[in-house]
């Protein structure tokens, strides 16, 4: 039975964290103390210094030679059970699919262990649980977040291949080469493809950034260069309603990617021409960055910092976009202002006003809303450019969609995943902490005091600043439940009921009993991890649902975890 003293101990551990979160919320929502630019600086400090150093501090002090193998096995089995069940559901049921597999796996198995788990479990079940939580943090950072990133890149690669090579053409791809400046396929930067076909019909595909081969002299010739800041800071706080700039599609095997951002611009990225923006008439050039991604997660895998690279289009006197001349192409393409038209319920195209296909005008705002919905539904919709003579043959007539061989896809995904992990500070902090702990506890080498105190002074700020950053993020959201009540309820049930049930089953299966079993169950009922939300936002996969679980879940998780604590103590 839980005593009042034990309950008070738990509240003493949790109240300071929530105090920091609500202070940040009030300072932005009501007092207007911090501007978004100032919030960006706070997030930058937390994401680059405070929390990576906090991770290093915990991991380096954990003895890897005394790891609780049964506890780790239970956690691993629970995640494997969930992944296998979701995979079977995605394969054998029409309602399933890779998109929901990724989202539901994130919700059910990846809680906020570092910031919430360590202080909460330590207050509930004692100091030994800190070691257990640190072990789970290591596994999350090194294994599970890498797996999640792999799945997201797989989805992005499939969308790109389907857009560029509909039907059976993709089956002929023998090699995919990714330029060094392409960090990810998430669409944050406009991409273009170049293809070569040998005498045997095998295709060699090259993925490039849209401006990687365009000289500065060509870029500077544009009449309407839009000034945008560099993305190297990459720490802005954003709302879930921030315009999405990561939706892209191609128009067949011609090497053209069409990239849609949330600034009412359409990015045309051609194999011969650099990508440029089409600005919505009447609104002028947008000051938003194409490559910018703002992360509210101060202690998660941060999106890959990239320098800004832009290639804008020329605009003549009447607002008609003009394709810039490319040294590779040696010619100039011009396109009149496009009209958006629906081809079917889930497929729409950009056609020339002189095209022969019947047209139904819709606003650019509607088109940009419809495009991500079609992608989320299955990734089968595409936008085509009629003026360039694209093939409008329905996908069903082309044949069943094929993909390159597993080896080709594996090489592609491993390449981009490795590049992305290499630019994440938490990757280095986790690995360095693990390496130091292996050395330190093997030969009893203490960390020098000057290094230890330097790390401690920064890591001590990690927990409070991480919660402060979450409060800033919550304050900037227009809605607490942006995904709607139905999806929010489903997500909460999966997070706070299904997750602990799978963890309890796996723990009992491996023989966990007593306080370790209770700690495993309560750990699975922690609020939603932030890293899955960052990935969901970056790859545009159900970000509203993950945002709801981050915001509302932080509030709901405290009474839920205490309820589990009380019930398990009966």
Swiss-Prot record:
Major site of localization recorded for this protein: endoplasmic reticulum
Ranges facing Extracellular side: 1-6, 60-70, 122-131, 452-454, 513-515
GO molecular function: auxin efflux transmembrane transporter activity; identical protein binding; protein homodimerization activity
Reported induction: Up-regulated by auxin. Down-regulated by endoplasmic reticulum stress treatment.
Keywords: Auxin signaling pathway, Endoplasmic reticulum, Membrane, Phosphoprotein, Transmembrane, Transmembrane helix, Transport
Post-translational modification Phosphoserine, affected residues: 230, 308
Gene Ontology CC entries for this record: cell periphery; endoplasmic reticulum membrane; plasma membrane
UniProt-annotated binding residues for (indol-3-yl)acetate: 51, 112, 114, 145, 530-531
Topology versus the membrane: Multi-pass membrane protein
Compartmental location: Endoplasmic reticulum membrane
GO biological process: auxin export across the plasma membrane; auxin polar transport; auxin-activated signaling pathway; basipetal auxin transport; negative regulation of ethylene-activated signaling pathway; negative regulation of lateral root development; root hair elongation
Pfam families according to UniProt: Mem_trans
Transmembrane segments: 7-27, 39-59, 71-91, 101-121, 132-152, 431-451, 455-475, 492-512, 516-536, 550-570
Cytoplasmic compartment spans: 28-38, 92-100, 153-430, 476-491, 537-549
InterPro entries given in the database record: Auxin_eff_plant, Auxin_Efflux_Carrier, Mem_transp_PIN-like
Tissue specificity as recorded in UniProt: Expressed in the vasculature of the primary root, cotyledons, floral stem, sepals and the main transmitting tract of the reproductive silique. Expressed in embryos, shoot meristem, root tip and lateral root meristems. Expressed in the nectaries and the floral organ boundaries of the anthers. Detected in pollen. Expressed in broad subepidermal domains that narrowed to sites of vein formation. Expressed in veins of mature leaves.
Family membership noted in the UniProt record: Belongs to the auxin efflux carrier (TC 2.A.69.1) family.
Quaternary structure note: Homodimer.
Task performed by this protein: Component of the intracellular auxin-transport pathway. Regulates auxin transport and auxin homeostasis. Directly involved in the regulation of nectar production. Involved in unfolded protein response (UPR) activation. Involved in the control of vein patterning. Redundantly with PIN8, inhibits the vein-formation-promoting functions of PIN5. PIN5, PIN6, and PIN8 control vein network geometry, but they are expressed in mutually exclusive domains of leaf vascular cells.
Protein name: Auxin efflux carrier component 6
Gene: PIN6
């Amino acid at each position: 039975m839980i005593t009042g003293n034990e309950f008070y101990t738990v509240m003493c551990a949790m109240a300071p964290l929530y105090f920091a979160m609500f202070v940040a919320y009030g300072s932005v929502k009501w007092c207007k103390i911090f501007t978004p630019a100032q919030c960006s600086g706070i997030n930058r400090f937390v994401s680059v210094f405070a929390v990576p150093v906090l991770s290093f501090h915990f991991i380096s002090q954990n003895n890897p030679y005394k790891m609780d193998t049964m506890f780790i096995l239970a956690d691993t089995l629970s995640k494997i059970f969930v992944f296998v069940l979701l995979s079977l559901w995605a394969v054998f049921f029409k309602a399933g699919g890779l998109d929901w597999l990724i989202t539901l796996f994130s919700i059910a198995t990846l809680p906020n262990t570092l910031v919430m788990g360590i202080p909460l479990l330590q207050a509930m079940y004692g100091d030994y649980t800190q070691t257990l939580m640190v072990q789970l943090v290591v596994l999350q950072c090194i294994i599970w977040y890498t797996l999640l990133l792999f799945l997201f890149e797989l989805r992005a690669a499939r969308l790109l291949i389907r857009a560029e090579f509909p039907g059976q053409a993709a089956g002929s791809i023998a090699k995919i080469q990714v330029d060094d400046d392409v960090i990810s396929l998430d669409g944050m930067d406009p991409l273009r493809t170049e293809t070569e076909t040998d005498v045997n019909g095998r295709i060699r595909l090259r993925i490039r950034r849209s401006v990687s081969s365009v000289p500065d002299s060509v870029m500077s010739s544009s009449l309407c260069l839009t000034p945008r800041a560099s993305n190297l800071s990459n720490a802005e706080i954003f709302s879930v309603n921030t315009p999405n700039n990561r939706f892209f599609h191609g128009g067949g095997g011609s090497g053209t990617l069409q990239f849609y951002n949330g600034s009412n611009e359409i990015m045309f990225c051609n194999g011969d021409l650099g990508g440029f923006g089409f600005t919505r008439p009447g609104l002028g050039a947008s000051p938003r960055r194409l490559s910018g991604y703002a992360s509210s997660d101060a202690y998660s895998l941060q999106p890959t910092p990239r320098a800004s690279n832009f290639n804008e289009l020329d605009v003549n006197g009447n607002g008609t976009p003009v394709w810039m001349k490319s040294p590779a192409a040696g010619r100039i393409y011009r396109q009149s202002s496009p009209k958006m038209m629906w081809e079917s319920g889930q497929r729409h195209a950009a056609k020339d006003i002189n095209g022969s296909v019947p047209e139904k005008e819709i606003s650019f705002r509607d088109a940009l809303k419809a495009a991500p919905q079609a992608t989320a539904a299955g990734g089968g919709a595409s936008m085509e450019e009629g003026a360039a003579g694209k093939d409008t043959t329905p996908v069903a007539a082309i044949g069943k969609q094929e993909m390159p061989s597993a080896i080709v896809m594996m090489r592609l995904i491993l390449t981009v995943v490795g590049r992305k992990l290499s630019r994440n500070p938490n990757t280095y902090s986790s690995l360095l902490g693990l390496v130091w702990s292996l050395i330190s506890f093997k030969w009893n080498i203490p960390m020098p005091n000057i290094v230890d105190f330097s790390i401690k002074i920064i890591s001590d700020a990690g927990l409070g600043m991480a919660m402060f950053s979450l409060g800033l993020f919550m304050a900037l959201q227009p809605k607490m439940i942006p995904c709607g009540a139905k999806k929010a309820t489903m997500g909460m049930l999966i997070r706070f009921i299904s997750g602990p049930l799978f963890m309890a089953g796996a723990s009992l299966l491996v023989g966990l009993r007593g306080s370790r079993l209770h700690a495993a169950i309560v750990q699975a009922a922690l609020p939603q991890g932030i890293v899955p939300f960052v990935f969901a936002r970056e790859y545009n996969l159900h970000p509203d649902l993950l945002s709801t679980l981050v915001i509302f879940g932080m509030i709901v998780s405290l009474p839920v975890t205490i309820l589990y604590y009380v019930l398990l103590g009966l």
